[in-house]
């Protein structure tokens, strides 16, 4: 049976913390931590802005830019931080020559946790 409760994006942050804290992690582990950390914050931000009636998301790739631009218009620092997380996520997901260390993964998760509390 499928649950009728919506997914809580904080679960992505919990997963990111688990992945980043694994000292035996490999590139797939640490890259996934960056990706999940970004998506946790992005989804919380999108839902918050939608619930407040600030945006009408299309539930497509264009929502990433929409959320970042909207956050920047409301609080430049928060929007810039989310954009930085997105760029890290893009690098981790698409640039195969990039190396992501455990330290970078842990720092990214910490940044995502701090940013989530500002939303």
Residue ranges and their predicted role:
Residues 1-119:
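Terminal alpha-helical segments
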């Amino acid at each position: 049976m499928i649950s009728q409760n919506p997914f809580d994006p904080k679960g992505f942050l919990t997963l990111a913390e688990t992945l980043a804290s694994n000292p035996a992690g490999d590139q797939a582990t640490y890259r996934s931590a960056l990706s999940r950390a970004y998506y946790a914050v992005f989804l919380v931000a999108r839902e918050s802005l939608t619930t407040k009636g600030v945006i009408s998301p299309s539930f497509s790739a264009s929502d990433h830019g929409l959320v970042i631009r909207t956050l920047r218009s409301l609080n430049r620092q928060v929007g810039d931080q989310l954009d930085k997380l997105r760029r890290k996520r893009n690098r981790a997901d698409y640039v195969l020559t990039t190396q992501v260390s455990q330290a970078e993964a842990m720092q990214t998760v910490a940044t995502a946790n701090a940013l989530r509390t500002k939303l």
